[in-house]
UniProtKB/Swiss-Prot annotation:
The active site is at 117. It is found in: Cytoplasm. The gene is rhaD. This is Rhamnulose-1-phosphate aldolase. Coiled coil: none annotated.
Amino acid sequence: MQNITQSWFVQGMIKATTDAWLKGWDERNGGNLTLRLDDADIALYHDNFHPQPRYIPLSQPMPLLANTPFIVTGSGKFFRNVQLDPAANLGVVKVDSDGAGYHILWGLTNEAVPTSELPAHFLSHCERIKATNGKDRVIMHCHATNLIALTYVLENDTAVFTRQLWEGSTECLVVFPDGVGILPWMVPGTDEIGQATAQEMQKHSLVLWPFHGVFGSGPTLDETFGLIDTAEKSAEVLVKVYSMGGMKQTISREELIALGQRFGVTPLASALAL
């Protein structure tokens, strides 16, 4: 029998959650991670599935995700513990044929359930599927320290925040030319914040929740982790620069344009115009 804990997707989730914990982005049960799979990914592991999978209805139907499997982190679970007991802290779920709910096929033992941010994840998956023609498969939410810190001192405006991050590190414009979406502060774990996040995900692969954390999307676990890591590194640089009295020189608008041309990306116009 094939052991699902040795599958590429369980091992990938273990690595991503462990790395995020070691970065200091996911204290206690902070953060959540979902990866969209294909039936072929889970086909070898049916013998590992629960004999009577639990069914959980969604708060709103998502027909775009019908019959789609995901691997998800659990509600109230600590990222630091995923590596110790994957079956207790992760779960493979599959949305039903009409997108009204999902079955827990594997993991989430002892009656555990998926992350409370599942509405935000699933809604964001829907938008990123449309925005990237199905290329994006990962949604990651974490409490990246310096990005959170900047939401207290920068104007919480997409153009302003994006431009500052682009100037904080040369690679940022290349990695996220579409900029960073920003929400107003909202209560987490609700359909409302999920809908607002998904709306920003139509235009941006990164979305900030002020005073809380960040959502990132990408085609793989590595790409999504790297996206957030890149933005967080720039935020760390900016926090240090501001604490030293602010910028005396920076990357100019003309240099940002040249950077975009060199790497074949189109920078967010509103950020470039500042």
